[in-house]
UniProtKB/Swiss-Prot annotation:
Protein name (database record): Argininosuccinate lyase
PANTHER family hit by this protein: ARGININOSUCCINATE LYASE (PTHR43814:SF1)
Pathway given in the UniProt record: Amino-acid biosynthesis; L-arginine biosynthesis; L-arginine from L-ornithine and carbamoyl phosphate: step 3/3
Substrates-to-products reaction catalysed: 2-(N(omega)-L-arginino)succinate = fumarate + L-arginine
Entry keyword set: Amino-acid biosynthesis, Arginine biosynthesis, Cytoplasm, Lyase
SUPFAM superfamilies: L-aspartase-like
GO MF annotations, alphabetized: argininosuccinate lyase activity
Sequence similarity: Belongs to the lyase 1 family. Argininosuccinate lyase subfamily.
């Protein structure tokens, strides 16, 4: 039976009926629909609409629906997850099941279910991001004070600790967690009681319903509550930024795994071979992370475009906001799991990376800094060291291999302290500012990252 058949005298066109159904995908919301229905039933009993016996029958029926799931969603007459639950409840509990829809609308139901889903996915995604951060911290600790080149414009820039590079990604993922936490605050409001658009005709205690479902409070406006999908856009956009960060890291790992760089060895459990070339070991896991991040961006855009011109309040277009949310959540979770596994399995060729950090004139900035400490204005120091690099390039040697006479001819007074300042440990130690790559600063950053990670775990425990 349709939920709205009384006003109609003709049946739906069969093709349209099948085409407009959402149950094949919104059955993912079944647990949340059952939970929200249980809270609504409890509120109906509190308002005197249901007796305690009727409430018990409805709750027993809902529990059975939750246990059974929706293994067969092929009945073309069942439109969506809301219709499915109500129909099954009537089958299980009898006529009392028809009372459940008193004072509510599918408009508020889907808004509630989707908020519950987003909240759950935020919590799971946060835990998985934290695991990626934990893997980065583990690897940062494992490489000690080994160095590597940093890059700007994909050209060698200055030496940094490998740990400093890994912690750069940890910082990105920490920001992702704060974005999700911020999104969760706005998502965690309860639309139930808003009904179709103007509010319910039953004297329901909306604050009580919100508490039953773990929401912070009821929504403030029934028109907005039934048409708001800002929380979904924010969620998917937050996931798209996570995807960007995962993609950037994957791209660097792909580059660093090439023979030309040789900085890391791909773990076999996260690589594949070639059907044609026997020697190949391909970074498929990383390439898929990089490629699938595009889908997260596309889903975010799809949501925004779907909603951009909708009048208030609910419109059927909003049915099309669900699948981008589901797809983004599932894809992002998979990408995070794969990335954490890869990070724990990858082998860094620290000797190769450390050697690379000592070549390519990456101590030029340190040399200029040394001259500044001797009282030479930076712009002049920059010019002098630039000339020294030019000479070293012509001589096919490193900056620190130029003789004192070579440097004197350029106007640089070079003694033992100058050459000492160009050695890798001194170059790294020179960056002794908060957030810099000096070993003591990186050690401090590692401790801070671990403390932040512990705090995130404690917050998640409270949320759960």
């Amino acid at each position: 039976m349709k939920m709205w058949s009384g006003r109609f005298s003709q049946s739906l066109d069969p093709e349209f009926e099948s085409w407009q159904r959402s149950l094949p995908f919104d059955k993912k919301l079944l647990r949340h629909e059952v939970a929200a229905s249980g809270a609504h039933a409890t509120a109906l009993a509190k308002a005197g609409v249901l007796s305690s016996e009727e409430l018990a029958l409805i709750k027993s029926g809902l529990a059975q629906i939750a246990r059974d799931g929706a293994p067969d969603a092929d009945d073309p007459s069942i439109e969506d997850v809301h219709h499915f639950v109500e129909s099954r409840l009537i089958e299980i509990a009898g006529e009392v099941g028809r009372k459940l829809h008193t004072g509510r609308s599918r408009n508020e139901q889907i808004a509630t279910d989707l908020r519950l889903y987003v909240r759950e996915q935020i919590d799971e995604t946060t835990l998985l991001i934290a695991d990626v951060i934990a893997a980065l911290i583990e690897r940062a600790e494992s490489v000690g004070e080994a160095a590597m080149p940093s890059y700007t414009h994909l050209q060698r820039a200055e030496p940094v600790l490998i740990a400093h590079w890994l912690l750069a990604y940890a910082e990105m993922f920490f920001r992702d967690i704060t974005r999700l936490a911020d999104c969760r605050k706005r998502a965690n409001l309860c639309p139930l009681g808003s009904a179709a658009v103007a509010g319910t005709f039953v004297a329901l205690d909306r604050g009580y319903i919100a508490t039953l479902l773990g929401f912070d409070a009821p929504t403030a406006n029934s028109i907005d509550a039934t048409s708001d999908r800002d929380f979904a856009i924010e969620f998917v956009q937050s996931l798209s930024v996570i995807g960007l960060h995962l993609s950037r890291m994957a791209e660097e790992m792909i580059l660093f795994a090439t023979t030309e760089f040789g900085f890391l060895q791909l773990p076999e459990q996260f690589a594949t071979g070639s059907s044609a070339m026997p020697q190949k070991k391909n970074p498929d896991s990383l390439e898929l992370v990089r490629g699938k991040s595009a889908a997260l961006l596309a889903h975010a855009m799809q949501l925004a475009v779907t909603l951009k011109a909708l009048p208030l309040a609910y419109n059927k277009d909003m049915q099309e906001t669900q699948q981008p949310v589901f797809a983004s959540a599932e894809e992002c979770i998979a990408m995070l799991r794969i990335t954490a596994g890869f990070l724990r399995a990858v082998k860094f060729n620290t000797a190769v990376m450390h050697t690379a950090a000592s070549t390519g004139y990456m101590n030029a900035m340190a040399a200029a800094g040394y001259l500044v400490q001797q009282g030479i204005p930076f712009r002049r120091a920059h010019e002098l060291i630039g000339a020294a690099v030019k000479l070293a390039v012509e001589k096919h040697c490193e900056l620190h291999d130029l003789s004192a006479d070579d440097l004197r001819n350029l106007g640089i007074a070079a003694d033992d302290s100058f050459y000492a300042a160009l050695q890798l440990p001194a170059v790294l130690a020179q960056k002794n500012v908060a957030g810099g790559t000096a070993p003591n600063q990186v050690s401090t950053a590692l401790k801070a990252a671990k403390k932040k990670l512990i705090a995130i775990g404690e917050v998640q425990h409270v949320s759960a």
